[in-house]
Swiss-Prot record:
SUPFAM superfamilies: YgfY-like. This is FAD assembly factor SdhE. The gene is sdhE. It holds the Pfam family Sdh5. GO terms for biological process: succinate metabolic process. Keywords: Chaperone, Cytoplasm. Belongs to the SdhE FAD assembly factor family. It comes from the Bacteria. Its main location: cytoplasm. Gene3D superfamilies: Flavinator of succinate dehydrogenase. The lineage of its organism: Bacteria, Pseudomonadati, Pseudomonadota, Gammaproteobacteria, Moraxellales. PANTHER family: FAD ASSEMBLY FACTOR SDHE (PTHR39585:SF1). Disulfide bonds: none annotated. InterPro entries: SDH, SDH_sf, SdhE_FAD_assembly_factor.
Length: 85
């Protein structure tokens, strides 16, 4: 990563490291390949996503339940597409 990261970008990247393989499999590729070049609106949405609790994230990624915002659901689908094609 670049030394030119903003404080907010550093925080989001740090928070994206969950230590939970089921979530990291989606977050890691996105952070490494797409996050820094994403539009500001998508970065803000990803920041909101990584601020959620692990049990909620697991339910959303495994489609047990849906996130409260349609935008979060769309971002989750995008992250899943990056991994599964």
């Amino acid at each position: 990563m670049s030394e030119e990261l903003t404080l907010e970008e550093r925080k989001v990247i740090y928070r994206a490291r969950r230590g939970l393989k089921e979530i990291d499999v989606y977050f890691d590729p996105y952070v490494k390949n797409y996050y820094l070049t994403a539009p500001a609106s998508e970065k803000a949405l990803f920041a909101e996503l990584v601020a959620q609790e692990d049990p909620d994230l697991l339910d959303w990624f495994m489609e047990v339940s849906e996130p409260p915002q349609v935008e979060l659901k769309q971002l989750i689908q995008k992250l899943k597409h990056y991994v599964h094609g």
